[in-house]
Each structure stands twice: as structure tokens, then as C-alpha cells.
Amino acid sequence: MDVTRLLLATLVGFLCFLTVHSHLVFEETLGDDRSLKSNSSINSLDFSSVSIVALNKKSKKISRKEAEKRKRSSKKKASIKKVARPPPPSPCVATRDSCKPPAPACCNPCASCQCRFFGSACTCRVLNPNC
């Protein structure tokens, strides 16, 4: 019975060695100049050359103008989407201020009173910024 255990232990050890050895990455030695040359020639053919060109002042101005136009158009779209909101009630609580239940409503119509820690800390918070 001891012989079978010894054989099983040897077999398990050999299998562990094979699995570890099969997953190791083989390092290239400096003596393999042929493989290095073939790899470098393949790599140089695969990638096209990249040239870095400095932008002149005119192209910078054009890109700034385009950015400003985009910014203006996004502001116009945002202003169009806004709907007239009802005026806030006269006694109201500002955003991020304490709004315990006896306090009046929040000034921002998109804000709501949110309580934490079993209702001990309540603040007016805007949950949906696109309200």
C-alpha cells in the first residue's frame, strides 16, 4: 500500500510540474539572432509610420472657433429644453440645508428632502440634475 501511495504522489507531482512548465513563457536568448531578425522584419511591415506634425496658428484658431460654435449650440439646445418652473414658496429651504419635517419645502422644485440615519439628518438634495 505504501508503494501505491508513493506512485500516486509521484504522479501528482509530475502532473503539477507539467502544468506549471507548460504555462511558462520561454525567454528568447541573445544567440537566436535569426528569430530576432525575423520578428523585427515582421513588426516593421505590420505598422505604418506615424508622423507628428505641429499645428500652425491658423489651425489652432479654427479648432477654437469650432469648439466655441459647439459650445454655443449646446447652450442653445439646453436653454430650449428648459421649461418654466413654478416659483418657489416664500418660506423655503435652500439646497443642501437642513430640512427636518417641521421645516418648509425645498426652494428648488427638483430637490427633495432626503433623510439619513433614521431621520436624524435631513437635507434638501437634487436627485435628478436634468429635471
From Swiss-Prot:
Keywords: Disulfide bond, Glycoprotein, Knottin, Secreted, Signal. InterPro entries: Agouti, Agouti_dom, Agouti_dom_sf. One of its GO terms (cellular component) is extracellular space. Gene3D superfamilies: Agouti domain. One of its GO terms (biological process) is melanin biosynthetic process. Transmembrane segments: none annotated. This is Agouti-signaling protein. The gene is Asip.
